[in-house]
Amino acid sequence: MTAPNSTPASSRKRVRRRRQDKPALSAKLVLDAHVKGDVGVIATDLFADLFPHLWANGDSQDTVHVAIAPWAPSQTPEANNWSIVPVIRSSTVAPSTVQFSPSSLALQSFATHLQQAAPSKLSGHNKGGIEILILDVSPIELDTVFVNLDGELAKRLEDGEGTFFREHPVNGKGKARADATPEEHLTAALRTALGTLKIVHSGDFFPLPLPPHPVTHQPPNPGRITLCEPVAQGILAPTTKIIVSRVRTSKTKRSSASGQQQGRKLNGVAEDDEDAYFSAAEEDRDSKTNAQTAETDADDTEFEPQAGEDEDNLSDDSLDEIISLQVPTLPTTVTGQSTIGTGTPTMLRGRKTNGPGSVISSYTATTARPDRPRGRLFKAHGLMKPIPPDLLHPKPTPEDDEEACIYVDMRDLTRVGCFSGDWIRVEAASEPPSNGLGAFGLGSFVEQEADEINWRPARVFGLPEGYSSRSATRSHHSRHDSRNSSFFEAQSQKSNPPAYTSPILLANLDNPPYLRLSPIKRPSSSIIKGVAAQSKTSSTLKPPFAREVILQHVRTPTAVERDVQSAVMAGLKHYFERRLRVLRTGDLIAVPIDTQLGKALQESTIPGEDSAIDEVLGLIAATRPGQSLHYDDVAWFRVGHVQAMKQDTTEAVDGEEAEDLWGGIACVDISLTHLEQSGSVTGRIPGTISNSWQYYLGIRKLPKHQQNPGLPAQLQTLEPEKQYVSSLRRKLRELMAAATSKPALHLNLPPLAILLVSTQRHIGKAATAMQACSDIGLHTFAIDAYDIVNDGGGGGGSDVKTAGFLTSRAERAMSCGPESCVLLVRHIEALTADRMVSSIKEILADARVLIATTTEVEKVPDGIRALFTHELEMSAPDEQEREGILSSILADRGIGLDHGVDLSGIALKTAALVAGDLVDVVDRALVAQRSRLEKLTAKATGSITFRDVQLAGGPAASGLTKQDFELAVDAARKNFADSIGAPKIPNVTWDDVGGLGNVKDAITETIQLPLERPELFAKGMKKRSGILFYGPPGTGKTLLAKAIATEYSLNFFSVKGPELLNMYIGESEANVRRVFQRARDARPCVVFFDELDSVAPKRGNQGDSGGVMDRIVSQLLAELDGMSGGEGGGGGVFVIGATNRPDLLDPALLRPGRFDKMLYLGVSDTHDKQVTIMEALTRKFTLHPTVSLRSVAERLPFTYTGADFYALCSDAMLKAVTRQATLVDTKIRELNAAAGPEGKQISTAYFFDHYATKEDISVMVTEQDFLDAHRELVPSVSAGELEHYEQVRAMFEGAKDKDKKKEGAGGDGNGVDGLESGNRNGMLAITMGDDGAGAESTKKDGKGKGKAADNEVNGAGEGKGKEGVSPFQESGGDEDEGLYD
């Protein structure tokens, strides 16, 4: 809505606020050619109801905006697709009417929604109007509009060919300058063209300001709006960005594309764009072809009885199944058992082409049956939500039972042989054979007993428009439309038409995969009366009323609680009061209840006032259904006995025929029927794996794609998409199904006891067990062991009380049936008393399935643990499991997603998070979405409300976006790091690490490759998951480890040596195990051992009394061996060690499979590398333009480590800050001196608020600051220490280069040159040593002079070397071969 720009100054009336909870109004949309332009006309009464705050202004003709949607029973903004259109009020319009021009561009979006919801309303001009829902709305200014434009037309607009004609303005608005650039020409033309749309909708077409073709006068192809941000529809603002995407249109499509804009009108022409729609009239012409598609085999085919023919003359042989083989020509005699030829005279039963012995038909097993199944075969589908009766025709009465109805497509009613609203026979059927034998399958000639057929009468209705699925592709038309085009097409498996019904009705029919629908069998007296009797029997007659009905309560864990009995009785009373229920003996009745409200009312009322509670609950359910009551459970009842009244009909000859006609069902009228509840029974309920009763009864929310009414053929009718099922849930389901099966009960097999173990909490053990029970229809009675221990109390005899409480609750669970109820004990580690072993044994003696969960399995007593037959471990979910869990959470809550959201990417970012953490991620994403929408409403101009954003629609407004999930994942990962004790990693990236190019490449090969390409390691190749950084202190070993964790989005564990030590025997090794277990739970992650030489020194050299360090090293070796395989839970865990004394490490740590990747981190040996490090450290500094880092680096020695460079840059920045502060203080003193002693003295804060310039605020580091810091800096590592580290490096790397052939360089040289040439790939290492000898000789002292030999260590160059290499280095020397070449 656009409020008036001017308000009279004299008007001091208080502005009325718009209601956000206003329900939508029903109105009619009339297309009137007399209405000109794109703005509609709204009736005065609608204007007064929608805009009461503007109604008081009098005769205001300002344009306002309303949101319209095709009429639907649900009037909430979230459940409909709304289109915002501009209107003005008029007193000449009929009440409750909105008029638009048939060619209005504003109705393009509404036409799309109407086509999906009710296509027939687009097929012709509806003079009575189109029923719509209408709401007031304020449009939002759009930030970005994405436009698709033909490339040639865009080029013409860039050339300035745009002319403004017809609906385009003729003034100069929007025209570009004469000297404008091509981009300005295009921008001006598009902004003018989009200006013709009063409201911009996603998917709208708009005319371009180009002249038509000079010869054909055909207008150019219109532009198309592909996307609007931040909402799907709004107004174009001057600040709106227009992004053009140029597409190429083929010549064959240009003619049709030019008429797309005119096709998207509501004047009787359906839109004809790339999403082609075919109306019912087109499909009627292909009804025979569509009938072929729906056939499965000859068993499922039946023709309608013709005039003068009895229904016994019907045959399953159909003309639709005739095979057309034209070439080569076959004899006219068709294969089959019949010997009657083409010259056979007319048979006794009349001229037929589909009977036995026909010249066209084959002799089949179906025709050989004495009493073949009658009716049409349909695929059974349970409804996700009841179909509103207002959409059905004929409209059912309010008392009709919706659970006794079946819905099929309108075109399938004729094949059943009935009309919409007739009573039919519904028979449970099995799946038809899929092999080539067809009706000749095994057992096809065996006659089935009539008593074995599970059937019942039900009313059939045609699916409302928009619900039925219709093919969107044209069928191939051949010359012989009634014949199959080939033999192989006739033999192919074809789908049956769907039939939708209540999942409760399907459960009472034993959940059959198929239903056979046929007209209800007429009594013998009705056959004489003919068609009139058939019509009367099918539609007019009703089942007999019940005289007495006995109900038995199905015991479930929730329904047996005393606190919810009042809610159960109130729900049962309401169930029979609002409908005439159709029941028969053995039926299940599902009564949804609100247990929370029932318990609250039970606690707040006086004992004995149960009748008042029933009345309150019944009144709430009757007056505000679905708004105040939030159903969270279902009470189940079974019909024990139904006694029907004698039916006074003329059709029935005797009682047996009447009973056979209705199959034992009866209508329950609470005013006539004696309803009695007698006792209770135990048994299973329908399993959710094959029944959708949880969605149908409102216990679970519908998935978002099911709640979208813009989806034809799938609007609350189809079953939900297949959700992710974990392997553990599937295994639990199989074990419980086997333990509770009839053979297991008959053979009295031992009970099933399962212990679910995990190392993390909130991983979903109990939820997985409950879901597995619900899948197969078992009840779950959950017990928390800590609650039992608390109820037992302290003091003497607490164990006896605890055991008593456990036994009593187990007995209550067994009252629901041992074969149909599972006892779930959570946190079983709390039951540590010895008496619990005997108590659990007693429970297992009566129960069939016992499931216990624990996160601390070592605390479970051995006696209790030995009672379990299965022990299953639930580990942290991997990437695919996390994606499945996320999709399940979103589906259960009915949350939609933006098109840009990729759940697999979110699953990758949520590594190490379990199910409970993923629920928290979704909750945080919802909070982020709410905050984003609130910011959008606050940012928008005018009176924009939160409901306006919802009405504007779009995936970003109605669902979660990628930004919402990013905020949620970041917050969840921070909380997860706190929960597992992982340190917070600073935001260290590769940019913060200067140089070390070869080290980065080696790290990428070790870590990134297994993460991004796991298929390379799928054939048994072991991953190299251990990296050892060694070198002088301050060279960036810890910084590099943090950068690895940040760059690859890994969790980071930092382990110090003293953290692992413990005074108790065995605890130090246990600490090592816990570290790696936490790493496996948090994978992918990095375990960083800083100062590894203190954690794992050489074994046998320590003087500790108990050999603690030796045991720690042994445990560390055992854990490292499990990391490289990846199959045993170690995949995704990378171990990084850092030390400056690798010679002190235990040699076993450096063998293959452990720390086999050794990377030396040294100092910079060239000024170029020093400049690279300084650039990384000063990338956030503001350097003076005259600063040259190279000139600074040339004055620095080669002994500076990374830490020294960090200190150098930090000191330089500090000196710059000090210098700038001194200058500011000098200016303040000068100002105070100029003001004099009597003037106002200014402070530092006042100076920065009023006098400071940009130069005073900015701090720029000069080259002199670096030089001053260099003079004061003392290197952290001396030249002698660097020489020692270089010797250590040569000792470790010498074995790797020993067998390589190098071209040595002769001559003498100093140690610096030799080390520089011996360094590999720019490794940051240099030794400022004395002039030394040349290449390594074979002497023991390692010194000598001469040319480098092929087998020498240091390769080309001269320097000091060392001959002795320990055996362990030679064994693992080839692992890093070629790394430093």
Curated annotation (Swiss-Prot):
ATP binds at G1031, P1032, P1033, G1034, T1035, G1036, K1037, T1038. Residues 270-284, 296-315, 1372-1381 have a biased composition (Acidic residues). One of its GO terms (biological process) is protein import into peroxisome matrix. It is a peripheral membrane protein. This is Peroxisomal ATPase PEX6. Residues 1294-1305, 1337-1350 have a biased composition (Basic and acidic residues). It is an enzyme of class 3 (hydrolase). Residues 11-20 have a biased composition (Basic residues). Interacts with PEX1; forming the PEX1-PEX6 AAA ATPase complex, which is composed of a heterohexamer formed by a trimer of PEX1-PEX6 dimers. It catalyses: ATP + H2O = ADP + phosphate + H(+). GO terms for cellular component: cytosol; peroxisomal membrane. Keywords: ATP-binding, Cytoplasm, Hydrolase, Membrane, Nucleotide-binding, Peroxisome, Peroxisome biogenesis. Its main location: cytoplasm. Component of the PEX1-PEX6 AAA ATPase complex, a protein dislocase complex that mediates the ATP-dependent extraction of the PEX5 receptor from peroxisomal membranes, an essential step for PEX5 recycling. Specifically recognizes PEX5 monoubiquitinated at 'Cys-6', and pulls it out of the peroxisome lumen through the PEX2-PEX10-PEX12 retrotranslocation channel. Extraction by the PEX1-PEX6 AAA ATPase complex is accompanied by unfolding of the TPR repeats and release of bound cargo from PEX5. Its EC number is 3.6.4.-. One of its GO terms (molecular function) is ATP hydrolysis activity. It is found in: Cytoplasm, Cytosol; Peroxisome membrane.
